[in-house]
Amino acid sequence: MTRRYWNINLKEMIEAGVHFGHGIKKWNPKMAPYISAKRKGTHIINLARTARFLSEACDLVFDAASQGKSFLIVGTKKRATDLVASAAIRARCHYVNKKWFSGMLTNWSITKTRLSQFRDLRAEEKMGKFHHLPKRDVAILKRKLSTLQRYLGGIKYMTRLPDIVIVLDQQKEYIALRECAILGIPTISLVDTNCDPDLANISIPANDDTMTSIRLILNKLVFSICEGRSLYIRNR
């Protein structure tokens, strides 16, 4: 894996609140190596470790993107919905930002069937085929299309399992991480002080509750993916 400089600095992370963990009563002992202090009943994350693992993650996604590999970004927190979508679109990644359906990856054949139905319905609507149907049927189809768009819209162009999955909240997206582990898909995950750093291939210790923190980490990863994609295009 090629090592590069990704302009990760401590001041920027402090300003974004990346270092604020959970209350000391909610911690996971496995996170001890990534905690530098306690302040007013809250664990403080060691930002030197954050910088190290974020840099490793950036190197990994850069190398993968430069080889034309695919990514899936998973973040279903309500406040992060728009952030996940815009970041994924910017880097041409697939994304899930509403709800993770159990078996989305492990039952890929079923997911593929749903995606095929979704694409067919979108095509029929665009071609005006709904106009020839009774109003009741049109209402049912539009409702189904709206539901599919809401939950599968971010993966509508996904034709195979992703090469790397990026998870923004380990506890909320635990099922997604387990599915990746079963399938052997490499994962990158933000881990707050109440998380288990052993569940992902690269765990980035960081505040996973504050949008400024999530945005900073995600933007670094997305920038690295974009740089890798540019190299891939130039070398084709």
Swiss-Prot record:
Keywords: Chloroplast, Plastid, Ribonucleoprotein, Ribosomal protein. GO terms for cellular component: chloroplast; mitochondrial small ribosomal subunit. The lineage of its organism: Eukaryota, Viridiplantae, Streptophyta, Embryophyta, Tracheophyta. This is Small ribosomal subunit protein uS2c. Its main location: plastid. NCBIfam families: rpsB_bact. It is found in: Plastid, Chloroplast. One of its GO terms (biological process) is translation. It holds the Pfam family Ribosomal_S2. GO terms for molecular function: structural constituent of ribosome.
